[in-house]
Amino acid sequence: MPKERVDVLAYKQGLFETREQAKRGVMAGLVVAVLNGERFDKPGEKIADDTELKLKGEKLKYVSRGGLKLEKALENFGISVEGKTTIDIGASTGGFTDVMLQNGAKLVYAVDVGTNQLAWKLRQDSRVVSMEQFNFRYAEKTDFEEEPSFASIDVSFISLSLILPALHRVLADQGQVVALIKPQFEAGREQIGKNGIIRDAKVHKNVIETVTEMAVAEGFSVLGLDFSPIQGGHGNIEFLAYLRKEEHASNQVVSEIEPLVEKAHREFKDE
């Protein structure tokens, strides 16, 4: 498991505006692990880079900081999930599920290939159907009692090209999708740098072009693009795509790709 300095990780996860602030914050004992509350007070200490951190005493808005990704997408793309049946593909601890519930979703299918990851408070919620050890690429309409009209996708170690065909089978016509594009799982192996990090803006641009073209081919119009407000594993920049299932799908973001990638790289240039 790759490791990262506590102060760098705290900065990357958005707890502080600068690395210097993060360093001082760690030394002051302000940074703790979300999972078990362990406190870190040595900025240079190296911990697993997938350790989720928070500020001491901070009440997280969602069960996972990852929920901030979907929150941004719903706000920026003007999507409402109120009263809808939805799917959270790659639910993990349930950050996206939590966002959907807090925004009025009627029912959420929380789907994940793993087991025992979904937060306890979500397991206990009658509006959540937990579908563990479920490989969504083989999903069929009959797997879902209610037809979903919204889906989020946040998957790792698998390309969206294996998820979208299954989602097309399951999702209602005109159903909306927020898909997290993770270049590190879409690019060719030769394009991925040390520790699984992609820093080349050209690779990001090519990945987004490929994924959006593939989405159209699978019957989804591409209506919007943005970058994730927080970085993914190992510090990778990730992107948000707004899709809609349509009979005559089209790509409406072609001209936005290059400016968006440039903007994302400016935003995270010191990471």
Task: Show which residues each predicted segment covers.
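S4-like RNA-binding module at protein N-termini
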Residues: 4, 20-79
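Conserved class I S-adenosyl-L-methionine
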Residues: 81-92, 100
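Glycine-rich SAM-binding Motif I of class I
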Residues: 94-95, 116
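Conserved S-adenosyl-L-methionine
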Residues: 99-107
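S-adenosyl-L-methionine
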Residues: 109-162
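A short glycine-rich, Lys/Arg-flanked "PGG" loop and its adjoining helix->strand segment in the class I
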Residues: 161-178
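Conserved beta-strand signature within the Rossmann-like core of class I S-adenosyl-L-methionine
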Residues: 174-183, 187-188
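Flexible, glycine-/basic-rich loop-and-beta segments that form/coincide
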Residues: 237-239, 243-271
